[in-house]
Amino acid sequence: MSRATRFKLYRALLIVAIVLIVPVIFIVGITLPYLFNTIKITFPDIVIDKDVESYIAEKELLFENTDPRAKKKIIWHDDAKIKTEYSIVYLHGSFATGRQQEEVLVKIAKKLKANLFISRLAGHGSGFESTKSLEAKNFLEDAAEAVAVGNKIGNKVILMGFSAGGSFALMAAKDQKLSEKIDHLVLVAPWTPKLSPPYFLAATGLFFKSQYKFNFPRMFDLPNEEWDPFWVNEFHRELPRQLWVAAFSGRKLEFLETKIPVSYTHLRAHET
């Protein structure tokens, strides 16, 4: 074999090695650590030692870019603003706000003669900047806060969650302290993070870009001028990262001995 032929062969082998090895190094060094990144699930003790509406208003003052209709809110059963037998607390899905389901939630609350609290997950509906410094624990705080508010406005708490909100609601119900403050659990298409090709590709893609833009209203055939404030159309990569970390970390939590009734609804569109 001539020197020129050997050189071509070595060069070809080197190219093949690079093509095969570089992706493996990238996957092992970037993608897998991201997907397997977890935290210890600990829910904070939320103490509301003041008027509950004042407490919520003060918390939301920190987020000036939030549309008033997307903020955390209590919808009282009547003008007396007193505790009802049941309270409904709602955790919405990822990249949305509680505005999307508010009309339905109000109808349910009226039917049950219940006060209603619609929460707002961290980084949702509050502008791009609020998505940059998120931590997974923020979503656990949201769930704990929702339960605390529910106990301030109702004698019995119905904790309801949709998609990612359903994941955090389920995790809250598995916590020993919080489970004692929850009387019913309603899960609508709860997000169950699992290692699959779509998540693998998404995790890899987040490495290359930090800022993302989507048009969620258009995806659902909704007018932008009306619905833009209630979707996370622009976000930093930390938002999906920390959502994943929070939900993935809680996937193996086990139910303690409990008698909490659970209502579960699954949507085929959420099979991922």
Language model segments and positions:
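A conserved short beta-strand
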Residues: 180-190
